[in-house]
Design a protein with these regions (language model features):
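Non-catalytic pre-domain segments flanking phosphatase-related domains
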Residues: 2-190, 198-202
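Short, glycine-anchored, charge-dense loop/turn motifs used at functional sites
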Residues: 189-195, 263-267
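Conserved acidic, metal-coordinating active-site core of Asp-based
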Residues: 301-303, 308-396, 402-412, 417
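Active-site phosphate-binding/coordination module
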Residues: 205-306, 310
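A short acidic (Asp/Glu
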Residues: 198, 236-241, 318-319, 405-411, ...
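Phosphate/oxyanion-binding active-site loops and adjacent basic polyanion-contact surfaces
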Residues: 203-207, 277-284, 369-378, 402-404, ...
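Short, surface-exposed amphipathic charged segments that create phosphate/polyanion-binding patches used
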Residues: 263-274, 369, 460-468
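Acidic, Mg2+-coordinating phosphoryl-transfer loop and its flanking beta/alpha structural elements
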Residues: 229, 396-456
Length: 469
């Protein structure tokens, strides 16, 4: 069963560039006395980051729409970077206050994303100042994104460029695979694939350079582009965290493809979930909202997964990857969750408490026994838009974990000669599983981090632009 609902919310080296960005930061950093003895609260941190992300979206829309970029928007990025790297942050560990205690979280992803964006924008604005009457696409072609991102590769700059060349050739073969004038399909996971992992799901925010490149790539080279993520659409979810236009050429899903944002509406696939299960999850979600505004538990809004309301479950972060939460507090929080489950489901026949990992637990609604995975999500969106994975045409699936393999398997079943796969990360067992599904090595690609594919996408767009001039 499918239901529709309106949305309820809405060539300078990299090192030289880094010094330039740092010089700008020195001009806007507050003095030590400005933040002495003041710890940012969890809510203040989230508010700061969401306000900054709004500025990112404005910049992305300006670039895509060939409009002016306001200096105030760039200044907001700089102010945010200065704030989150002030004296309360040491080695990317930021100390914050909760209602009754202190919390230390890792903000490396948030800080690095902002730094790379500032380097990207500096080059873009410098190019614009020398070519004031030129539109953004030709100016973007003058920005060597690979030279900015290479310094942040997890292994080495040399490895970055090796993977970059391989990925660029791979994407060329995908983009040039038009069959009878029919562009290919692009389907991707999000976290760890198109976006670096972040210690806090609630502030796992997409940078500008990534949003601009992905949107242009989807529009220029594909007939269907879709993001499938395990997280929700809202609350926060992918629609809150992305910097891409949510009603643009890239479609967004949450809950493994159970919920989609299509035509300005949330489309939900309820297969196997009872009405009482939905109702119980909704009431528990309300209970969790109240719990997070009480005493020690407020910090759990920013611990790992936070509180994610998915179609068939709640996913709750109970510990950070660095073990910053006291075990006793984590256990008390989980007990408080169970107590609220009992309020909602006193007979214990609707909701199931699943301590899935050391970092998060899940509260799952009983279902009819059907096991939903991302392959089901792919099928639903492809059929909804009246398309097919079948030949003719290529289908590129991108992922970074074993949970993404069902998408590859589905595409390989429907289109064995046209399926392609790009996987991110260093897990050799996962890579071997991909090789078994796609035996033609020209139709698979392995890279170490998302920035490699963003640099390759940007360069491919530049090549196509230059070839038409």
């Amino acid at each position: 069963m499918t239901v529709m609902a309106t949305d309820s919310s809405n060539v300078t080296t990299a090192k030289e560039d880094s010094q330039c960005a740092a010089d700008n930061d020195e001009q806007i950093h507050p003095t030590a006395s400005d933040h002495l003895d003041h710890l940012q609260s969890v809510d203040e941190f989230k508010s700061l980051m969401y306000s900054m992300q709004s500025a990112r979206r404005k910049i992305v829309m300006a670039i895509l729409g060939d409009k002016e970029i306001e200096n105030d928007w760039i200044e907001e990025l700089r102010r945010t970077y200065a704030k989150i790297t002030d004296s309360n942050t040491k080695a990317f560990q930021r100390e914050m206050s909760t209602l009754s205690s202190k919390l230390s979280i890792n903000i490396k992803d948030e800080a690095m994303g902002l730094l790379k964006d500032m380097l990207f924008l500096e080059r873009l604005k410098a190019t614009k100042s020398e070519n004031e009457d030129v539109r953004w696409p030709p100016l973007l072609a003058k920005v060597d994104l690979a030279s900015i991102l290479a310094a942040y590769h997890p292994i080495s700059e040399k490895k970055f460029f090796e993977e970059y060349e391989e990925c660029l050739n791979f994407l060329r073969s995908f983009a040039e695979s038009n069959s009878n004038g029919r562009k290919p399909i692009f389907i991707t996971d999000w976290d760890g694939t198109m976006k670096d992992y972040c210690s806090q799901y609630a502030t796992n925010l997409q940078p500008i350079y990534s949003a601009v490149g992905m949107t242009r790539f989807a529009s220029r080279f594909t007939r269907l582009s879709a993001v499938l993520t395990a997280g929700p659409l809202r609350g926060p979810g992918i629609l809150d965290l992305t910097a891409m236009p949510i009603d643009g050429p890239v479609l967004f899903s949450g809950s493994w493809g159970r919920e989609w944002w299509l035509g300005g509406r949330r489309v939900v696939h309820e297969d196997g979930i009872s009405d009482e299960g939905f109702d119980a999850l909704e009431r528990l979600n309300d209970e969790m909202g109240n719990l997070l505004h009480s005493g020690d538990y407020s910090q759990f809004a920013l611990v790992g997964s936070g509180v994610q309301r998915k179609v068939d479950r709640l996913t709750l972060g109970v510990q950070t990857v660095y073990g910053h939460v006291l075990p006793e507090l984590s256990h008390r929080y989980q007990d408080a969750v169970r107590e609220r489950m009992h309020r909602v489901d006193p007979q214990n026949h609707i909701l199931v408490f699943d301590p899935s990992t050391e970092l998060e637990v899940e509260v799952v609604a009983h279902n009819s026994g059907n096991v939903w995975n991302k392959a089901d999500g792919v099928d639903r969106v492809v059929s909804t838009v009246g398309d097919s994975l079948e030949t003719p045409g290529r289908v590129l699936v991108c992922g970074d974990t074993f949970s993404d393999l069902p998408m590859v398997r589905q595409a390989a079943t429907r289109n064995p000669e046209g399926v392609m796969a790009l996987f991110v990360g260093l897990n050799e067992k996962l890579r071997q599983s991909v090789r078994q599904l796609i035996t033609d090595q020209s139709r698979r690609c392995f890279i170490s981090c998302p920035d490699v594919v963003h640099a390759a996408m940007a360069e491919l767009l530049n090549e196509k632009l230059n070839s038409t001039q």
